[in-house]
Amino acid sequence: MTYFEAFFLALLQGFTEFLPISSSAHLILPSEVLGWSDQGLAFDVAVHVGTLAAVVMYFRKEVVTLLSAWTFSIVKKEHNKESKLAWLIILSTIPAAVCGLMFKDFIEVYLRSAWVIAITTIVFGLLLWWVDKNSTLVKDEYEMTWKKALFLGIAQAAAMIPGTSRSGITITAALYLGFTREAAARFSFLMSIPIITLAGSYLGLKLALSDAIIHFGFLGTGIIVSFISAYICIHFFLKLISSMGMTPFVIYRLLLGTSLLAWLALT
């Protein structure tokens, strides 16, 4: 890996982690299309740390409120809408955590390919477009129920398939349930905090138990660049969807998917 590759991949991770266009697809493509070597376990941990820090920093007020309410619901048995939402975020994390433990190796071996990415990019892009155009979008995140949270959790688990997009499929599921675009995005981003924490911790444990060589310059680049780009991305995404909806991201997914299919057919 070079510093240019580290910068480019971290920028890619930061800009795509929270957009409905699949960060995993964009990180796989450089190795598939450009022939770049795998970025390595340590770099994966670094960009997870950067994007996690970005979403926590952006939603710091909400995170503090939810954590406080959740703590009081346990210690003092005080329950309110914030503690309920915190518990529902935890519930929504369970399906992805379980599926990650059960199917991660299978997905890495059989589904991590450019063909799968091309197809899922197109299919789930069209699904996002259809749901965005045909659903009644009136609910906010505090109208979440345990059944809806579990449904979103199952959607998040399906995002393990490369090209699906974690934010894309969870936002699609939330729109289908009638949540506004802004509420769907906010809940999707809040859902990402525990799952990115779990994924980063798992990768960190693997790194600690491995003999991998750690290049702290690349790690620092990964953390800083992914943090800045993810923070900017979250800010502008939340402003953009209120006026333009999901159409720009659907168009991008269709262009990416069809271009990738064409490239695969010609090589």
UniProtKB/Swiss-Prot annotation:
- UniProt GO molecular function: undecaprenyl-diphosphatase activity
Membrane-topology descriptor: Multi-pass membrane protein
Instruction: Provide this UniProt record's keywords sorted from A to Z.
Output: Antibiotic resistance, Cell inner membrane, Cell membrane, Cell shape, Cell wall biogenesis/degradation, Hydrolase, Membrane, Peptidoglycan synthesis, Transmembrane, Transmembrane helix
The reaction(s) annotated as catalysed by this protein in its Swiss-Prot or TrEMBL entry are: di-trans,octa-cis-undecaprenyl diphosphate + H2O = di-trans,octa-cis-undecaprenyl phosphate + phosphate + H(+)
Superkingdom as given in the UniProt entry: Bacteria
Transmembrane parts of this sequence: 1-21, 39-59, 87-107, 111-131, 149-169, 189-209, 218-238, 246-266
Specify where it is mainly localized. Answer: membrane
Q: What class of enzyme is it?
A: hydrolase
An annotated GO BP: response to antibiotic
InterPro entries per record: UppP
Q: Where does it reside?
A: Cell inner membrane
Q: Could you confirm whether the keyword Chaperone appears in this record?
A: no
* Cellular component aspect of the GO annotation: plasma membrane
Keyword 4Fe-4S listed:
no
Q: What EC numbers are recorded for this enzyme?
A: 3.6.1.27
- Note in the entry: Bacitracin is thought to be involved in the inhibition of peptidoglycan synthesis by sequestering undecaprenyl diphosphate, thereby reducing the pool of lipid carrier available.
- Family to which the UniProt record says this protein belongs: Belongs to the UppP family.
Entry-linked HAMAP family: Undec_diphosphatase
**Task of the protein:** Catalyzes the dephosphorylation of undecaprenyl diphosphate (UPP). Confers resistance to bacitracin.
Report the NCBIfam families cross-referenced here. PRK00281.2-4, undec_PP_bacA
Q: Mind telling me what this protein is named?
A: Undecaprenyl-diphosphatase
To which species is this protein native? Aliivibrio salmonicida (strain LFI1238)
Taxonomy of origin reads: Bacteria, Pseudomonadati, Pseudomonadota, Gammaproteobacteria, Vibrionales
